[in-house]
Each structure stands twice: as C-alpha cells, then as structure tokens.
Design a protein with these regions (language model features):
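Conserved alpha-helical substructure of the radical SAM core
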Residues: 57-97, 107-112
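Short glycine-enriched, charge-decorated loop/helix-capping segments at active-site entrances
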Residues: 65-70, 166-171, 180-181, 250-256
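Conserved N-terminal glycine/acidic-rich loop preference
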Residues: 20-22, 27-31, 35, 86-103, ...
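Canonical Radical SAM [4Fe-4S] cluster-binding loop centered on the CxxxCxxC motif
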Residues: 7, 16-18, 27-74
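Auxiliary Fe-S-binding modules of radical SAM enzymes
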Residues: 1-31, 35, 217, 221-310, ...
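Conserved AdoMet/S-adenosylmethionine-binding subsite of the radical SAM
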Residues: 104-238
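Intrinsically disordered, low-complexity segments enriched in small polar residues
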Residues: 313, 319-322
Length: 333
C-alpha cells in the first residue's frame, strides 16, 4: 500500500531547496540584489480574464502607466535577445514571462520560450506570472522546464464570488465567457488548486494582491491566511492605481486609488512585518537621456555604477528601461 505522506527528511530537503532559490533570486533576497540581474520578455499578449483594474493596450505614444511594454516578441526573438543581453551583462540570471497578457493564456509561446532557453541556457532561472485560471493544467510543464518561481495574482478568497465579481467581470473558460459570481468562483477554485500543486512540488510561489478600497480591503486578511496555509512564500499587497488616463474600468468609473496609509493598514491587518521607512535610494536610468548609444558604453556605465556603489548600504537597485529599444524590462539588482 502506497503512502501519500511526506517523510521528515524529504520535507527538510524541500525546505533547503526553497531557501536556495530564495537566496539566489533578486526578487526575494536583498543580498541577491547586489549580484544578479533579471529580464522580462513580452511574449504572451492574450489574456483569459478581464480585470477591472487592467488595460492591456501597449505601445501608445502617450503611455504613462508603469511597467507597460512597447511591443511584443515571438519566442525566437525573445530568446535571441536574452542570449545577446546575457552575453553582454554577466549578472543576468533570471528570465520572466508576465504578459502583456497572461503567461498561461499563451501556453504555446510561453513554453516554447522556456524550452528554447532551457536547451540553450540551462543555468538561467525562469519564472512566470499568472492569474491562475489555467495553472493546474500546466504545473507539469512548469516543472518540466525548470520554472521554479511562479507569481499568482489573487485578490479574494470569498467562496460566494461576491467580492470577485466586483473585480472580474468575466473569465474565458472552456471556450466561452463566464460572468459574475460564477466566474469568480471558478477562478478562485483554480487558483487555490494550482498553488497547492506548485507548493507540493517545491516550486516557489509568490502571491500578489491588488488593494481595491471598498472592494477587497476587508477580504485581504482572509487571502493572507489562506495563502499561508497553502505554503506561499511571499504575499505582496499592491495599491490600486486608477487614474482616468489609464483607461481601466475602475479609472473611468471613479474608483479611488489606494493610499499609502491604506496599504500599510492592509499589511498590518494581514500580519505582515512592516519595515520602517526605507532610507535606501533607487536610481532610474534612461539611456536616451544619458545619450548612451552603444551597448559597450551602456555596459561600461553600469559596471562603473555598480563598482561605485558596491559598498554603499543606501544603494539597492539600478533599473533602466528602453535598453536598445528592446521590448523588455531589464533590471540590475
């Protein structure tokens, strides 16, 4: 008779493996910020749910939203550019796929990219972000291509679907649109199932939640409790940004953005350790402003900065976008 229980030795092995992943990933380890770089590639344009805080338009000349790509890539283009950048910047160690839609709503492109990278650059760490709707269907492939970090956006664990229906108007499920509370309940069930499958396999899971005042602010402590039960390593609460010019449903209909005070209150309600106000400084570099036209001049400039600030405790990230006009975000951490 087989036993489904996990032995203490195997549990210890999983914990050691998870700690190794945390310590070497710039998104999770403060120490890794100083030594590693990450790159996100936009190979996944389609999405299978509609969020009231989201607008997937990109490459607009008047774009003002943070983190929006200028164009999308085919898997072959993405891999070529990743290998090129990795050859120039030796600190590159993490590759992520997060959109501009949902990574698992574009499984062919997402896993083709991961497969090619796994074959050509097996030392790179790979991660993806997803809304979780299709997560249970692709856990095997996630593990197959050594994708060991997954971020899931989960904004409610209300089993009635009431809260979720105010965030997600519809989902695309089994080739048809499902609306309202039914959609929210399906999404939640799939998210929880997928997260459990990942953590059972020792795959590191981070969860993002968007704080939407008057919608899910009272729900987030329940989200935090459930995520802890499922073995999620990190829960990140982000403020809703709902300016009218962003073109989202919330922005166009007067939903208030979340304030810093509301975010801190939500973090405290979720039992998070709130650090004192950071004295660290961030440096945002735009190549067009610096007029650094060649990759060699950019590389020399960045290496000079890293050397100059290596011993400074108040320096924690060098970030730049628009690098050689590549449709990606590259962050040196």
């Amino acid at each position: 008779m087989s036993c489904s229980c996990t032995s203490s030795s195997s549990q210890e092995s999983i914990q050691e493996d998870i700690m190794a992943k945390i310590n070497n990933h710039p998104c999770y380890s403060e120490g890794a910020h100083q030594h590693y770089a990450r790159i996100h590639v936009a190979v996944a344009p389609a999405c299978n749910i509609q969020c009231n805080y989201c607008n997937r338009k990109y490459d607009c000349s008047n774009e003002s939203r943070p983190g929006v790509t200028s164009s999308k890539l085919q898997p072959e283009e993405a891999v070529k550019k990743i290998l090129f950048v990795g050859g120039e910047i030796q600190q590159l160690s993490v590759v992520g796929i997060a959109g501009p839609g949902d990574a698992l709503a574009n499984p062919e492109k997402t896993f083709k990219t991961f497969k090619m990278l796994y074959e050509k650059a097996p030392d790179l760490k790979m991660c993806l972000s997803t809304n979780g709707l299709m997560l249970p269907d692709y856990v095997d492939k996630i593990q197959q291509y050594n994708v060991d970090h997954v971020t899931v956006t989960i904004n409610s664990v209300d089993e009635t679907g009431e809260v979720g229906s105010r965030i997600y108007p519809w989902i695309l499920w089994n080739h048809k649109k499902v609306f309202g509370k039914e959609a929210a309940k399906i999404l939640l069930q799939r998210q929880l199932e997928g997260i459990k499958m990942l953590t059972d396999r020792g795959i590191l899971v981070k969860a993002n939640s968007v704080l939407i005042p008057g919608v899910n602010d009272q729900e987030l402590p329940n989200v935090a409790k459930k995520l802890k039960e499922l073995g999620v390593f990190l829960h990140n609460i982000m403020p809703l940004l709902s300016k009218e010019e962003y073109g989202t449903y919330y922005g166009l209909n007067g939903q208030a953005s979340a304030t810093d005070q509301e975010v801190m209150a939500a973090q405290e309600a979720c039992g998070m350790d709130i650090p004192k106000k950071s004295t660290k400084s961030a440096l945002l570099i735009f190549p067009s402003i610096l007029n650094l036209k060649s990759i060699n001049s950019m590389r020399r400039f960045l290496l000079h900065l890293l050397d100059a600030f290596a011993d400074k405790s108040d320096f924690f990230v060098v970030s730049f976008s628009g690098f050689l006009f590549l449709p990606m975000i590259l962050t040196l951490l």
